[in-house]
């Protein structure tokens, strides 16, 4: 089987001046993840490696540089799933781990359980060699400013255009007092990262990592780390990672919805396109999806203005910011 790696850096209303940073981040993650596959590593190795790079890049809403909770802290969620045997590891609401995808790998390999939350997840990770950090190490000044701006605008009735785009915001901001307007395009929101891969053995894997939504309530868990919602992998169907507004994705169990359609005969592209249409038609949701079939066929879809994505194969690399 020819190995393939497919990753995303979040589906959202990405401003023009954020494109270059996303392209650099996607390229770096592809390089590291592909090195795992090229050297004979597993799909799980490649997914973990690629997601780790994006967690360490504060361009993305995962790991350091993530959105802040309502009370100004970072809380992280991640899931990793092996399609060969359905072994899965997930963590949520962790505040003192730099790389939650690595903690998810430990849960997958070292625990009879599937999912750990909060201090229990952190305790498990330290018992298996991970180092705890102070939450402030995950916070960047940009996100403090973003949180304050968001909360000011929320109080003034400014609509949240994280996923749908800025057209509504342009109109709405013109009606706001000047001190409440957001003129810096870097203060628009961004989202979750993820990866899917197939290795030389024909095994699939998927992983998703996120800092969640901006100004979320402390303790809120989104779709990213929930099996079948923001992430799923099964050699008998497909591997998927999602990004976007988590609550509608959870209600639809959208990741499993998509892989089931591949199992029923749809191509990954058909299933991804249909899933994102279903997300909007049923619940008005916005987001994106990467999907990989057991034969290495790919699907990429989003209904947000942009979604950063990248593909690595033995033939080369392909990157994009839109795919419709």
Describe each model-derived feature in a short phrase.
Residues 1-324:
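Alpha/propeptide regions of enzymes that mature by internal proteolysis
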